[in-house]
């Protein structure tokens, strides 16, 4: 069954190979890769926002955005696909520390109206309601979106959060 998915993307660490890719370039390339796993119709992506890192602050600013599209598969299948995309952009889950710098971090924020609580996956994302860096870009593309468990509008949740210094950075040109 087709489900509308919302993914949160973040990057604050460049990728070196033959070329140097900065975080915003990584986000742009990740959006292009993510378009391949979603149905082509009704694929949306937000602007890029910049903020200080949360939880572990001794690192570079983080660039965040959300993407949304329709997906024909299970949450676990999607998790596997996004983990592969993260790895292709240099993420090594075995050699990183929690909330540390990332070349690319992709979180499943929403999977239609599904509620999932597994050992390796929680949907809606367990921290979505505390993260302005997710809520601001989410509301940019879906201003009337509601939290599926409580039904509370994300705009109302955002209004109650303290300022976390999330700033508009740029629109991507794909």
What is the predicted role of each segment?
Residues 7-13:
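Generic N-terminal amphipathic, Lys/Arg-enriched alpha-helix
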Residues 11, 67-73, 110-113:
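Short beta-strand-to-loop capping motifs
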Residues 12, 45, 137:
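Residue-level signal for inorganic ion chemistry
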Residues 17-23:
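Short, flexible/disordered intra-domain loops and linkers
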Residues 23-75:
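Short, surface-exposed acidic-centric catalytic microdomains
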């Amino acid at each position: 069954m087709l489900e509308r998915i919302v993914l949160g993307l973040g990057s604050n660490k460049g990728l070196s190979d033959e070329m140097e890719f900065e975080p915003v370039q990584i986000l742009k390339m990740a959006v292009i890769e993510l378009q391949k796993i979603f149905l082509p119709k009704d694929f949306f992506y937000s602007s890029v926002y910049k903020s200080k890192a949360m939880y572990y602050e001794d690192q570079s600013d983080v660039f965040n955005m959300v993407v949304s599209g329709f997906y024909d598969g299970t949450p676990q299948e999607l998790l596997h696909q996004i983990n592969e995309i993260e790895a292709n952009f240099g993420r090594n889950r075995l050699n990183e520390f929690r909330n540390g710098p990332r070349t690319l971090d992709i979180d499943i924020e929403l999977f239609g109206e599904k509620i999932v609580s597994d050992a390796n996956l929680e949907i809606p994302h367990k921290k979505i309601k505390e993260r302005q860096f997710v809520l601001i870009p989410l509301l940019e593309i879906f201003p009337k979106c509601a939290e599926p468990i409580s039904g509370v509008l994300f705009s109302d949740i955002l209004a109650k959060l303290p300022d976390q210094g999330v700033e508009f950075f740029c629109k991507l040109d794909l």
